[in-house]
Amino acid sequence: MSVTSLSFPYGESIQWFCADNAKNLPSSPLKEWLLAPGSLTQKLKGCCDKFEVKILGEGQCVPLEGEYPKQNAVWVREVLLCLDSVPWVFARTLIPQSLLSTRQADFLGLGTRPLGELLFSQDSFVPGRIEIARFTTDSRLAQLAQSLAQNVEHELWGRRRYFHHDEEEMFVSEMFLPAAVQAMARLQP
């Protein structure tokens, strides 16, 4: 698997909506995945024999317009979450500089360890609200999917989850790639 048509950072400016106010949400089962309150990592692991994190890039970056409340530099981590070697999710995480030195989490040393394992194993990180976004077939996310040999015939969907640690807030965005949506439909009882 190689990603050649784009480069880090892959993210784009996104209009996020509160799930309660979002209109025209996709039908189940994708809707259920978008709104799932627990760890997406755990949910994904339950659908495969081999789960892996492919790092696309990480480093200090200025957030995209409207992406973070402050326009100060944050640590950005972009990965693909793969199930049995197939990319299902593109994830983009924004971590404020003040959280990088917290003793409870070694964000800089995560490597290929899933971020969800860290966040959901620490009581000091409190999951917050979920927001939803829709991506057109000509978005950067769609281009990324196409570079992974995934055909983008329909709009794509993603979610952004807030995590709170003391007075700080970090964001984890998870966008479902076409392979995930197709597999979810097959998994539906």
From Swiss-Prot:
Tree of life domain: Bacteria
The keyword Cytoplasm appears for this protein: yes
Disulfide bonds: none
Species for this entry: Shewanella sp. (strain MR-7)
Molecular function GO labels: chorismate lyase activity
Classification via InterPro entries: Chorismate--pyruvate_lyase, Chorismate_lyase_/UTRA_dom_sf
Pfam families reported for this sequence: Chor_lyase
Family: Belongs to the UbiC family.
Gene3D superfamilies tied to this protein: Chorismate lyase-like
Function: Removes the pyruvyl group from chorismate, with concomitant aromatization of the ring, to provide 4-hydroxybenzoate (4HB) for the ubiquinone pathway.
Primary subcellular site in the record, as a coarse category: cytoplasm
Pathway: Cofactor biosynthesis; ubiquinone biosynthesis
Enzyme Commission number(s) of this protein: 4.1.3.40
Catalysed transformations (reactions): chorismate = 4-hydroxybenzoate + pyruvate
SUPFAM superfamilies the record matches: Chorismate lyase-like
GO cellular component: cytosol
Keywords: Cytoplasm, Lyase, Pyruvate, Ubiquinone biosynthesis
Localisation: Cytoplasm
Gene Ontology biological-process entries: pyruvate biosynthetic process; ubiquinone biosynthetic process
Annotated substrate binding sites: R77, L115, E174
Protein name: Probable chorismate pyruvate-lyase
